[in-house]
A protein has these predicted regions:
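Small-residue helix-packing motif on alpha-helices
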Residues: 4, 20, 36, 170-175
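NAD(P)-dependent Rossmann-like dehydrogenase/reductase catalytic/cofactor-binding core
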Residues: 171-282
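Rossmann-fold NAD(P) dinucleotide-binding segment
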Residues: 16-68
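Active-site-proximal catalytic alpha-helix in oxidoreductases
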Residues: 109-123, 128-166, 171-191
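Rossmann-fold dinucleotide-binding core
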Residues: 55-145
Length: 282
């Protein structure tokens, strides 16, 4: 993928995974969940030494036992609550992304101190480090993806369908909901000021409508959906299902992508993005 040459151009010493694992006393396993177990078993674990530290950025494979590290190494997690590119960008700005720290295995007696040093090394201690666990990070991360994201997407699709059926221009609906990026700004202000305090920024009409609507909205279906998702994660049911899906070649994932991409919502969305020049700069 070119990363080997990029690293050499940046004057890093570059080695194969087995050689890097053998040379290092601290190994960051920063690979996609789907491929990390095989890579660890074949290329990393045989080359680790007693007392080494194996660090993860996500707790998934350890929590669900797809990776079971040997007993004589420290196993830690520094999980920045930010995408990788932004972690680096914040670091160069003398800032940092907050992280969740977890210690799964403390073979040396110094695993937590070593993990904190790693957190400092990527800038996270400038922002804050939460003392958590692999389970804490995994369940909250997946709940955000499997509960919050579907609720938001379903709400937008519902508004689109209802307003379109009432005769409103589809393009105007999409721009109002998210294509204008107004909500990008709103979410930034939520993070900076708080969910309620950021309401001081829009008009009082908006303030009244949002707060009153929040009080009026009660849906046992959402609470039940949330509880179901939590239990799937807690029990390991989702992890087992996803493992089978990978083994079968992603038939359900591919079907779901096709289903959504063929929907009227996405078709009109893509045309609107193109028409208004809203896509990424080439």
């Amino acid at each position: 993928d070119g990363s080997w040459e990029d690293a050499k151009d940046d004057e890093f010493s570059v080695f194969s995974m087995p050689e890097a694992a053998e040379r290092a006393s601290i190994v960051f396993l920063l690979l996609p969940d789907e491929i990390a177990p095989d890579v660890y078993e074949e290329k990393i674990e045989p080359n680790l030494s007693a007392g080494d530290l194996l660090n993860f950025a996500h707790g998934y494979n350890v929590m669900y036992n797809f990776i079971e590290p040997r007993d004589d190494i420290d196993v830690t997690m520094i999980a920045p609550k930010m995408i990788g590119a932004a972690v680096r960008e914040l670091y160069t700005e003398n800032d940092g992304a907050p992280s969740i720290l977890g210690v799964e295995q403390d073979a040396t007696g110094n695993a937590k101190q070593r993990a904190l040093a790693l957190a400092k090394g990527i800038g996270s201690t400038r922002a804050g480090v939460i003392d958590g666990s692999f389970k804490t990070e995994t369940v909250l991360d997946l709940l955000n993806e499997q509960f919050i994201a579907p609720v938001i997407t379903t709400a937008m699709m519902t508004m689109f369908e209802v307003c379109r059926d009432e005769g409103y221009p589809p393009e105007a609906i999409l721009l109002e909901m998210y294509l204008s990026k107004e909500y990008t700004h709103t979410f930034e202000k939520m993070a900076e000021l708080g969910v309620v305090e950021q309401l001081e920024l829009p008009s009082q009409t908006s303030q009244y409508g949002q707060l009153k609507g929040g009080n009026e909205f009660e849906s046992p279906d959402i609470e039940e959906f949330m509880q179901d998702k939590y239990e799937e994660l807690e029990s390991g049911e989702f992890a087992k299902e996803w493992a089978v899906e990978q083994e079968m070649g992603y038939p359900v994932l591919n079907r779901l992508f096709e289903q959504y991409r063929e929907s009227e919502f996405v078709q009109i969305e893509q045309r609107t993005i193109e028409a208004f020049g809203l896509g990424p700069d080439e």
